[in-house]
Amino acid sequence: MNGSTVHVWFSLPSDESGYPPQDREPVDAEPVEGGFRLLRSPVYASGVALGDVVATQRRGDAEWATRVVSDAGNWCARVVPFRPLDAAFVESRLAAFECTMWTTRIGLVVLEVSSSAPTDPLLEELISGREENVWDFDLGVAPDSEVLRQYARG
């Protein structure tokens, strides 16, 4: 991290199965008026994505996110490839879409999607991959999409 980049920490509640595997997550951010702008989307924390500005509360030496001050309008997804497939498979299959991808140490692929990028084609591909049983995914921030509404209705 450089001098103007800080970690903003997010508390992570666990679900009944114990997911996520940690209780907090640091996300790189830069100070801006009114809070900190996220420089990447989180791996586990929901409700925030790249570019969002969050308010924080200082505890000890750390800044802890308390709320979203400004929503950048971006959305994010986390994709888990099923073995024997891996992150390279996910990245290859989704390379044609307008998104930025990065892979975690444990093989999750995080997709960051700008508010100006076409939403439905990428969502259709994510859903297809789930239905083909090659991956599962969740949305850290869900876009407004007719594809999602139809999928939720079954």
Across the structure, where does each feature detected by a protein language model lie?
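Extended boundary segments
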Residues: M1-P21
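Short amphipathic alpha-helix segments
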Residues: W9-E16, V48-L50, A55, V80-E98, ...
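Short, structured beta-strand/loop micro-motifs enriched in basic residues and often containing a Trp
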Residues: P31-R40
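Short, surface-exposed secondary-structure edge patches
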Residues: P42-V48
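A common structural junction motif
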Residues: R58, A96-M101, I127-D136
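Short, Lys/Arg- and Gly-enriched loop/turn segments at beta-strand edges
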Residues: R59-D71
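Short glycine-/aliphatic-rich beta-strand segments at the starts of folded cytosolic domains
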Residues: V68-R83, V109-L111
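Structured core of small recognition/catalytic domains
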Residues: L108-G154
